Amino acid sequence: MNMMRTAMLLAFMTALFMGVGFLIGGKGGMMIALLIAAGMNLFSYWNSDKMVLSAYRAREIDEANAPEFFHMIRDLSQNAGLPMPKVYIYDSPQPNAFATGRNPENAAVAASTGLLERLTPEEVAGVMAHELAHVQNRDTLTMTITATLAGAISMLGNFAFFFGGNRENNNNPLGFIGVLVAMIVAPLAAMLVQMAISRTREYSADRRGAEICGNPLWLASALQKISGMAQQIHNDDAERNPATAHMFIINPLSGERMDNLFSTHPNTENRVAALHAMAQEFSPRASTPPPSGDRPVRKSGSVPTTGWRRGNENERKGPWS
């Protein structure tokens, strides 16, 4: 299903590229756009994860320089039955996180310094388990390719005027009106694609993430905190790269106050409600209290060690059980 969804996404993005090319330069422009789209699809498959990590200036960490956070990811990955992903931290006061990579064998998870400093260990575990769920569900390929191509399509639409705005351009079958259509429709269509693939996968990743970390209430508490802080703390890199907004656990853009229909993410209250309902199904872990909101904020960028008990390997354990 995920491979089919990815193929349909690539086909739509390619068709959109060709359509904009046709509006700008007729059949010749359409063929050039097809070649560009094919090249970008191939490039995105192999390199889009590197581009996203580079855009946020994320730095890879290991057991030596961030042992506690690294160990937590290792334990959560083992609980999910996943290979150990590469682990990154990027500098941003806004608490948030994302996952990227073309498959579980070539995956990476990234957390902001704000996430590690402002959330409790249990909440961090819930967030990173959510990101690992995206890796396990193979959402990361779709997310990274969408971010790359949506940004390129928006750029092509924004520059359509300069490439095809000449009223005397005989290669443009629809003239100046066609260019205006390309400028408006292309970025909008790219945004709609991002919304379409984002909504249901977030609920699925929430549920699987709660299973991985062992307690839905940890993730629910994290979502509430991140959602509130995202409106108050700007993420400058995300503002410069809005096409990547759908990759984060909570939309990082400061202007995200749209309703459910036009949001890149499901409504946070709905996600939290679903997790609380899920907590009632969890046994015996449903009685585990949510993380304390009055715990002092940590000054370092590390997360306390998981303390995962190994006594019974068949029993699912959360990293702070």
From Swiss-Prot:
List cellular component terms (GO): plasma membrane
* Protein's membrane topology: Multi-pass membrane protein
Q: Which Pfam families match?
A: Peptidase_M48
Q: Keywords of this protein's UniProt record, alphabetized?
A: Cell inner membrane, Cell membrane, Hydrolase, Membrane, Metal-binding, Metalloprotease, Protease, Transmembrane, Transmembrane helix, Zinc
The main location class comes to: membrane
The UniProt GO MF terms for this protein read: metalloendopeptidase activity; zinc ion binding
Q: Give the start-end ranges of region Disordered.
A: 281-321
Query: Which stretches are tagged as biased composition: Basic and acidic residues?
Result: 310-321
Residues forming the catalytic site = 131
Gene3D superfamilies assigned: Metalloproteases ('zincins'), catalytic domain (3.30.2010.10)
| Residues that coordinate or bind Zn(2+) | 130, 134, 202
**Cofactor binding comment, as recorded:** Binds 1 zinc ion per subunit.
- Origin: domain of life: Bacteria
Cell compartment(s), UniProt: Cell inner membrane
Q: Which InterPro entries match?
A: HtpX_protease (IPR050083), Pept_M48_protease_HtpX (IPR022919), Peptidase_M48 (IPR001915)
Cofactor requirement: Zn(2+)
Looking at the UniProt entry, the stretches that span the membrane are 6-26, 28-48, 145-165, 173-193
Protein EC: 3.4.24.-
> What are the recorded Gene Ontology BP terms?
proteolysis
What family is it from? Answer: Belongs to the peptidase M48B family.
NCBIfam families under this entry? PRK01345.1, PRK03001.1
Q: What is this protein called?
A: Protease HtpX homolog
- The species is Agrobacterium fabrum (strain C58 / ATCC 33970)
Instruction: Supply the source organism's classification.
Output: Bacteria, Pseudomonadati, Pseudomonadota, Alphaproteobacteria, Hyphomicrobiales
Name of the encoding gene: htpX
